[in-house]
Swiss-Prot record:
Component of the eukaryotic translation initiation factor 3 (eIF-3) complex. This is Eukaryotic translation initiation factor 3 subunit L. HAMAP family: eIF3l. InterPro entries: eIF3l, PCI_dom. The keyword Cytoplasm applies. The lineage of its organism: Eukaryota, Choanoflagellata, Craspedida, Salpingoecidae, Monosiga. Residues 291-477 form the PCI domain. It is found in: Cytoplasm. One of its GO terms (biological process) is translational initiation. The keyword Repeat does not apply. PROSITE patterns: PCI. Belongs to the eIF-3 subunit L family.
Amino acid sequence: MEQETFEEQEITVADINANVPQEVQNYLRSFNKAIQEKSLKEIEEHYEYKWRRTTDQYFKDSRWPEPVYIQAMFEQEGQEDSYFVSLYPELYYRDVYYRSSNTNIEITVEDRHASYDHYIELINMFVEPDAPLDLELPNKWLWDMIDEFLYQFQDFVIFRSRVDDAKTESDYQEIAERPNAWNVTIVLNALHSLILKSEINEQLEAYRSGQNPTEMAGAFGKSSLYKMLGCFSLVGLVRLQCHLGDYRQALQIMKNVDLDRRFIFSLVPACNVSLHYHLGFCYLMLRRYQDAFRLFESILIQMASHRGPGHYDGGRKRDTIVCLLALAYSLLPQRLERSVEHLMNEKEGENIRKIQSGEGADEAINHLLLRGAPRFLCPFLADPQQPPEEDVLKAESERQLELFKQEAKQLILLGQIRSYLKLYTRMKLEKLAKFLELTVPQLRSMLHSFKHKMSQIVHTPGGEPLAGERQFTDSVDFYVDGDEICIATMTVKKSYGDDFLTASLKMVTSNR
């Protein structure tokens, strides 16, 4: 993978002391020692808590010391080969991006390019050796690396594509001089290289077929570091393909994953949420509403059970998922677990009613899509040296969402047919046509459309995410016998098991 180097600066001990407070130096040395000793508990403490505490104490309104000073500090102490020297820039630039939204810290084009270079250097550090690195890092840190790598790629694409006056001629020149910086092909290759090195697909395939994954893995596959990097890179690829609008490819990436036994991805809650959200959205856009329901409902139940101090707080993402669930429910109602249905109606009940009634449906669909859909990306510009003539990302989002809205409008009309069919067991075509203000030939065409739209590919347990069986997914089925419609309404008996499990889960959670 491409990497550009810059002229090294001569850093003296005086420079280090002037830019890195002594207490911060001690903290970084302690952090480095924890990594060298492979003490995951100590690493987690430094990564999760002490970093935040040190930031608040010394760098509340400013940046951490630049990576060159930290590198020089460890070189002065004869530890230039320390893993921490390669890991620190990732922490540094992630902190810059995070705090740019609520401080006076600004991200420059130089920052964006430098962060890209450090990420490529870091990924090369993992994939280039012939033997696994003698390194252990917490799963959350590994996920955060992949998550931040993709976030910064998305942010760069948005920044480069934005039509505004914030970018100067110098910015455009810097971007043009580095055409491969944050190039989508290089980003994809970086994730694929981690997946290949980790042998994660081979292990997942073995697991699905009932074999021992460890026996299928080589030295890299047996390393926890590489195994988790491979897992998280798979989820990152799903996310990236989803943002690029390639929904089938996003599902194909997970071909070796049993979606009903995905415990390895739940080791980091944020990773688990990302996987469910992006796969669910892909199913939604592919008109596989039943599968979307299943994933959205499952993750909302899991998120509810992990609330509380010390747990992942995905409030914003939860609301986003609820919007997509409400959208799918409005178009094709399904039976939901009681607590999920209550949450959905509480937050988006009004929009559901608007869509199902047809009054204000366009406004409600727009609201749910804009709040629930991911940010679509168009990673290429006609001329990187010139400001774009239009907001290409907005245009791409409008194109993707318009495709879904066309489908939604058809389903809303079919929903009106469903509401009449549920009231009868037999009904004359002419009678229903009068209710709908249609001719009988028009109604016949609509009934054919109803049958087609309600027949969907549904994932089969243990099968690949993209595969499935065609099933009729509506609660109302019918056939036309001459000039009469024969209707069968399928009802599901109330299951008290769900209520019992939900109450038990709440009791366990409240007693923690």
